[in-house]
């Protein structure tokens, strides 16, 4: 359920803080959110796929940790990101 290279490059370009930025929390969270959304769609069609469900839970946990880090480091960047991604409805 990996995202395509074009989609990944588009997300990196949109959320990067500067040229060549692939490791900032914003980029990592955006990529994880895309993966999580794809896995959710996959699991709706394949309810018995328990292995993918475990992978989904790991990705959600990783994103949660990155969001907590960003919230503690810079609350304004955190708020902008969750609004942009549509998290925390």
From Swiss-Prot:
UniProtKB keywords: Ribonucleoprotein, Ribosomal protein, RNA-binding, rRNA-binding
Protein name per its UniProtKB record: Small ribosomal subunit protein uS15
Family as reported in the entry's similarity comment: Belongs to the universal ribosomal protein uS15 family.
An example Gene Ontology molecular-function term: rRNA binding
Gene3D superfamilies linked: 6.10.250.3130, S15/NS1, RNA-binding
Record flagged with keyword Ligase: no
Organism: Lactobacillus gasseri (strain ATCC 33323 / DSM 20243 / BCRC 14619 / CIP 102991 / JCM 1131 / KCTC 3163 / NCIMB 11718 / NCTC 13722 / AM63)
Xref: PANTHER family: RIBOSOMAL PROTEIN S15, BACTERIAL AND ORGANELLAR (PTHR23321), SMALL RIBOSOMAL SUBUNIT PROTEIN US15M (PTHR23321:SF26)
């Amino acid at each position: 359920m990996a995202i395509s290279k074009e989609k990944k490059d588009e997300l990196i370009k949109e959320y990067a803080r500067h040229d060549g930025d692939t490791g900032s929390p914003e980029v990592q969270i955006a990529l994880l959110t895309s993966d999580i959304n794809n896995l959710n769609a996959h699991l709706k069609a394949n309810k018995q796929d328990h292995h993918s469900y475990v992978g989904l839970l790991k990705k959600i946990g990783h994103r949660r940790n990155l969001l907590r880090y960003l919230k503690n480091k810079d609350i304004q960047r955190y708020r902008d990101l969750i609004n942009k991604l549509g998290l925390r409805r």
